Regions:
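Short hydrophobic beta-strand element within catalytic cores of glycosyltransferases
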Residues: 273-285
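N-terminal subdomain of nucleotide-sugar transferases
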Residues: 1-47, 73
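A short, histidine- and acid-enriched strand-loop-helix "catalytic/donor-clamping" loop
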Residues: 11-13, 100-119, 131-134
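Carbohydrate-associated surface elements
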Residues: 141, 162
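Conserved acidic donor-binding segment of nucleotide-sugar-dependent glycosyltransferases
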Residues: 296-307, 315-321
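Acidic donor-binding loop of glycosyltransferase active sites
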Residues: 250-265, 281
Length: 357
């Protein structure tokens, strides 16, 4: 029998992530309540949102979806992202009133998350903690965080994310030129300022080095200013979809970011690392949150220091054999642990375990 699952998207939710993985689960038909038609094999119900402010807040969107309460109970499950998203609070009420099972997908790795203390996030969090049938954790740290919050083990499952191994694949010929790729939101919490400063140090020793930046965000002007100087070696590529991301990664020798925590966010995993590793790139980044769950040795996690970041980049840029060895190991690691179809089947198994109780 086909599982019928309703996914209520957050406002501004990014494509080809949680909803996409659910849509790949065997024996599952997903209906997405979302502002825009998502890619993939699923049904779409257009959604509009009530938003007191027009911004996305990490760990929860300050927005309510208008159409949810009017939907008939034509589903077995309803699901959403993160405990303290206001949409999750709505989904909890919807599931309770219609007798449906509820799943919450979560990356959150900090039980001291500041948003948990702020109404109305607090109400959404407490309702989901009390009533959700399944917490599908996308990192092990999220499961630890739920245990601290008192969630019983029977409702917790961990399935780490997968990626498209046919799209994110290594270049036919490894890149010999010293090209760095920063593919991430262009924001200070992702360390774009640190990367630019470290790259300036790299250029002193490797004048041929180039830094290519792909992404959008609040600090684009910083990157544009660097790229405007022909002597900087910085190229700003703007934004791009998954196909362009994969192409830019295959044209680079090393992947780099430098995240640092904020009052409401710390790095949980980092899909950009996963995609870079699938493309056979070594990764250099900073120690932040729980990114050690994906950035495993011999990739480098350094302290939040420009000189340390530059030194790690130079070690790889000046040693092509080491780069190739790390890149080959990364591809193998992702193939063995993060194939999106294998991980989607594991997600489906998590739902089935709850259904069998």
């Amino acid at each position: 029998m086909t599982r019928r699952l309703l996914w209520a998207s957050l406002a501004d939710q990014r494509p080809r992530r949680e909803l996409h993985w659910l849509s790949l689960m065997p024996g599952t038909r997903v209906t997405a309540l979302a502002a825009e038609r998502p890619p993939g094999e699923l049904d779409w119900l257009p959604a509009t949102y009530r938003r007191p402010v027009r911004r996305f807040v990490e760990a929860g969107a300050l927005a309510w979806v208008r159409e949810l309460e009017r939907l008939p109970p034509a589903y077995d499950w309803c699901a959403s992202l993160e405990l303290c998203s206001l949409v999750t609070g709505q989904v909890t009420r919807y599931a309770r009133r219609r007798g449906l099972r509820q799943a919450v997908l979560t990356w959150e790795n900090d039980p001291r998350q500041a948003l948990y203390r702020l109404p109305p996030y607090r109400a959404a969090t407490q309702a989901a903690l009390a009533e959700a049938d399944l917490f599908l954790c996308l990192v092990h740290a999220a499961a630890d965080h739920l245990r601290v919050l008192g969630v019983d083990e029977a409702r917790i499952r961990v399935v780490r994310p997968g990626t498209d191994l046919s799209l994110f694949r290594p270049a036919e010929d490894p890149v010999d030129e010293p090209v760095l790729a920063y593919v991430s939101p262009v924001a200070l919490n992702k360390g774009v300022d640190r990367v630019l400063a470290a790259f300036a140090l790299v250029r002193r020793r490797l004048p041929a080095a180039r830094l290519r930046v792909l992404g959008r965000g609040p600090d684009e002007l910083l990157v544009r200013a660097a790229a405007a100087d022909p002597a900087s070696g910085v190229e700003y590529l703007g934004g791009g979809d998954a196909t362009r991301v994969a192409a830019v990664l295959r044209e680079a020798a090393v992947f780099v970011t430098a995240p640092r925590s904020t009052w409401k966010w710390t790095e949980q995993f980092g899909l950009a690392y996963l995609e870079a590793m699938a493309c056979g790139l070594p990764v250099v980044t900073t120690v932040c949150g729980t990114n050690a769950e994906i950035v495993v040795p011999p990739n480098e996690r350094v302290i939040d220091d420009v000189e340390a970041l530059a030194a790690a980049l130079l070690r790889l840029l000046e040693d092509p054999a080491c780069r190739r060895a790390v890149g080959t190991a990364n591809r193998k690691y992702v193939e063995e642990r993060h194939d999106q179809h294998v991980q989607a089947a594991r997600m489906g198994a998590a739902f089935a375990e709850i259904e069998a109780r």
